[in-house]
Design a protein with these regions (language model features):
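An extended, acidic, His-containing surface patch that forms the Zn2+-binding/catalytic region
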Residues: 31, 39-41, 47, 158-160, ...
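A short core secondary-structure module
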Residues: 134-139, 191, 196-221
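Acidic/His- and Gly-rich active-site-bordering loop/insert found
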Residues: 1-90, 97, 107-116
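Short pre-catalytic strand/loop immediately N-terminal to key active-site residues, enriched for Gly-Thr
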Residues: 81-92, 372-375, 415
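Acidic/histidine-rich catalytic neighborhood of metal-dependent amide-processing enzymes
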Residues: 84-87, 91-173
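Short, solvent-exposed loop/turn segments at the edges of secondary structure
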Residues: 73, 115, 145-146, 167-169, ...
Length: 438
């Protein structure tokens, strides 16, 4: 993303609105603009304690041009009715940004005293390059800041345990790690010509064979410590069973759509460009993109090296260029499991989240329901939290702003993005309770 080509005025307007809507937060905190991202520091009573960070991102994905009329309410109107808050970013993730500020504003208005320093970090470009969170992370690292834990966006759903073969009950994810990210760009060159003489193969053929060769690479598959903790939490295995049967568990996970990305590096061809203009015309230069999500233990350099090796021999030798695309990131290091941040999330979630179909109208769990299980896991996407891994042993990706079934089906980046007012308020209640633990 070309930062100079971005219109930053909407971000300036958003920050001005934040200061107007949540004045106590910005009066009490030290406010810093880092690049176009925001860092607010609310000093605690005991400076010896490591700070906690609550974070989110201010940017949103675009609305597909031409679909604006398909929205029930204008996509950037922020329309609120009796049931829903509508608009792009209602779920991803203005709800968490606004909810954090609302919770802190409420706490300050009610005389909140906190031992630990609280950092609020709001990035500018999570949906693209993550430069904003990266800039904040570097500033904090240069200052020698070490966090106790942080909470970033996570899975927005409460899911049935049966989805994982775990019997009855309901679950929420607390993702403690994320996979690495790498885009591999393949390029082939050709003079083209008439399709009646494809001597040596067309550039499309060469590129296709290169894609297949790379997709056929076998990557190591294993049970990470975090996956082992997840399987134990789900009740699928005991710790002793995992230690004795890791190979069998890997095979089971590789056969499961839900679990296979958690045991190995994945490879997905996503883009191809440069076909010819006619059915009887051979294409000239072409390129393709293959997206990798790396399991802990496989580095960006490993991916580049193995892809180059896959196309280095035979008829492909010298005919395919392999480049690393922008925006790569290494997998999370092995995280702290069962730390104070996760325990706080577990304890508070047990008070505020139960069976989503049986919650009382005031947002509290219905009497007699079992609490939601909080499952430590790995997120297979990418988040801003990765930019803080060097200064934080417990990066928790967890959302207290739960979407309803319709929103799950539609997708958070789709038309008519929305969150219920009740879910938004429940997320704020969760955060207020979390603030009381600092």
């Amino acid at each position: 993303m070309d930062a100079e080509a971005v219109d930053w005025q909407p971000f300036d307007d958003l920050r001005a609105y934040m200061q107007q809507a949540w004045p106590r937060v910005f009066a009490a905190g030290e406010v810093e603009l880092i690049d176009h991202s925001l860092l607010v520091t609310l000093a605690g009573i005991d400076p010896a304690l490591k700070p906690v960070m609550l974070m989110g991102h201010m940017d949103v994905v675009p609305v597909v041009p031409g679909t604006e009329a398909d929205w029930t309410h204008a996509p950037f109107s922020g329309h609120v009715d009796d049931t829903y808050i509508w608009g792009r970013g209602a779920v991803d993730m203005k709800d968490q940004v606004a909810g954090i500020l609302e919770a802190v504003e409420y706490a300050l208005a009610h005389g909140w005293q906190h031992e630990r320093t609280l950092l609020l970090a709001f990035g500018q470009d999570e949906e693209t390059t993550q430069c904003g969170a990266g800039a904040i992370g570097r500033v904090l690292e240069e200052r020698g800041v070490e966090l106790e834990y942080l909470i970033d966006e996570g899975d927005y759903r409460i899911v049935e345990a049966a989805e994982y073969g775990a019997g009855e009950g309901w679950l929420m994810h607390a993702d403690l790690a994320e996979k690495g990210y790498a885009d591999i760009v393949l390029r082939t060159k050709s003079e083209g010509g008439h399709s009646s003489n494809p001597y040596g193969g067309t550039s499309l053929e060469v590129l296709s064979r290169a894609i297949v060769a790379i997709c056929d690479i076998e990557w190591p598959a294993r049970v990470t410590d975090l996956l082992a903790a997840q399987l134990v939490e789900l009740g699928l295995y005991t710790a002793d069973e995992i230690a004795a049967s890791k190979d069998a568990i890997v095979r089971d996970c590789l056969a499961s759509k839900k679990l296979y990305p958690l045991v190995t590096t994945t490879c997905a061809p996503t883009q191809i460009e440069g076909g010819s203009t006619g059915a009887n015309v051979m294409p000239q230069d072409m390129w393709a993109n293959i997206n990798f999500r790396m399991l802990e233990g496989t580095s960006v350099a490993d991916v580049v090296a193995r892809c180059r090796e896959a196309v280095a021999g035979g008829d492909l030798a010298g005919r395919v260029e392999v480049e690393l695309g922008p925006g790569s990131s290494e997998p999370s290091p092995s995280p702290r499991i069962g730390g104070p941040g996760l325990e706080a999330v577990r304890s508070i979630a047990a008070r505020y989240f139960r069976d989503p179909k049986g919650t009382e109208e005031n947002g509290s769990p219905a009497v007699g329901q079992e609490p939601i299980g909080i499952v430590p896991s790995t997120v297979i996407g990418a988040t801003d939290a990765a930019n803080y891994q060097r200064i934080c042993p417990e990066c928790i990706r967890f959302s207290a702003f739960v979407v309803d079934d319709d929103e799950c089906d539609r997708g958070v980046h789709g038309t008519n993005e929305r969150i219920t007012r009740r879910a938004y308020l429940q997320g704020i209640r969760f955060l207020i309770a979390l603030l009381q633990t600092l």
